[in-house]
């Protein structure tokens, strides 16, 4: 196995060497790929084969990402009027794919993530015996520089708490409370939107919330912050009512606008590529901070505001 790994190492660009690459080489050594007559050689058809092959390991969120990449590939294939075969995924393909995506105004980060998925499909195809191009392992798109992630400071949160009640509809008040809860609990929207008073227990005089994270399956015990307890007291011990992710994102932008969280902030947001055509892409720029607020800001705000003050284990 040492000779096999070293031989493979000497034949690829060292920038592609990572844990995934090593695991693939080990798999190849112990389970040499054989020709699989059932596996399609066309890339788009192979995506469906890949989904079926890994159906017991793939989460709904991952499946959603795969379908998005598949739709992008379908549009790309239609634009070039030529079927994409796995064996043709090489440097020329990569450049053509990048140029197409840029023309369609996709952000570089989106292009890079889509290409990582394309390589994943092709490497899996290689594993089951489908012919791939010798350039495959060396193909990469450089990740864009990370932009500073926005979060709500304690000053921002105080502004949100102090919004005049007569400015808020019931829906906005509900979203405002969820936003505060998320910023003081640090949980994902898929988890905090499922919070209920039945999940609360008391231990040594402290109120603790127990739940299972939807994404990870981990059992969590979270002490309830005084700001969360204030909201529960206001609502007779109940959490705000559940709303959809989309409505929550829309409402908290409005809440932060009412709180005058307007400082110019670098970031990206979805904008229509051309008025009236209904196609949206993420566009980077400088915007008012409230325009960049999304559901993940609660988790990010908690992590930033409480870093070093609350134990992480």
Q: What is the role of each PLM region?
A:
Residues 3-14, 34, 41-70, 128-129:
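Short, aromatic/basic-rich helix-turn unit that serves as a nucleic-acid recognition element
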Residues 102, 182-183, 307-308:
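Short amphipathic helical patch at the helix-1/turn junction of helix-turn-helix
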Residues 108, 112-114, 131-189, 215, ...:
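Basic, Lys/Arg- and aromatic-enriched nucleic-acid-binding interface segment
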Residues 123-133, 182-205:
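Short, charged phosphate-coordinating catalytic segments
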Residues 167-169, 238-239, 253-312:
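Short, basic (Lys/Arg/His-rich) helix/loop patches that form interaction surfaces
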Residues 194-233:
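Conserved tyrosine-mediated DNA breakage-rejoining catalytic core shared by Y-recombinases
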């Amino acid at each position: 196995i040492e000779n096999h790994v070293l031989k493979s190492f000497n034949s690829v660009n060292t920038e592609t060497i990572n844990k995934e690459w090593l695991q693939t080489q080990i798999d190849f050594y112990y389970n040499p790929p054989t020709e699989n007559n059932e596996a399609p050689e066309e890339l788009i058809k192979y995506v469906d084969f890949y989904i079926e092959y890994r159906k017991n390991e793939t989460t709904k969120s991952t499946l959603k990402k795969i379908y998005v990449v598949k739709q992008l590939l379908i549009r790309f294939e239609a634009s070039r009027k030529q079927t994409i075969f796995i064996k043709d995924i090489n440097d020329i393909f990569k450049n053509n794919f990048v140029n197409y995506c840029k023309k369609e105004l996709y952000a570089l980060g989106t292009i890079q993530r889509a290409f990582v998925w394309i390589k994943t499909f092709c490497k899996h195809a290689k594993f089951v015996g489908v012919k791939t191009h010798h350039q495959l392992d060396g193909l990469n798109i450089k990740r864009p520089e990370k932009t500073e992630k926005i979060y709500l400071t304690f000053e921002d949160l105080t502004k949100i708490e102090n919004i005049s009640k007569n400015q808020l509809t019931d829906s906005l008040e509900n979203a405002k409370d969820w936003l505060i809860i998320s910023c003081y609990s640090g949980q994902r929207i898929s988890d905090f939107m499922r919070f209920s008073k039945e999940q609360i227990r008391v231990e040594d005089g402290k109120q603790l919330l127990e739940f299972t994270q939807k994404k990870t399956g981990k059992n969590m015990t979270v002490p309830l912050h005084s700001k969360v307890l204030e909201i529960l007291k206001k609502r007779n011990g109940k959490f705000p009512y559940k709303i959809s992710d989309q409505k929550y994102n829309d409402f908290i932008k409005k809440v932060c606008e009412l709180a005058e969280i307007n400082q110019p902030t670098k970031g990206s947001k979805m904008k229509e590529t051309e008025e009236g055509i209904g196609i949206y892409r993420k566009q980077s720029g400088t915007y008012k901070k409230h325009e960049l607020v999304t559901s993940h800001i609660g988790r990010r705000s908690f992590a930033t505001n409480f870093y070093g003050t609350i134990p992480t284990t």
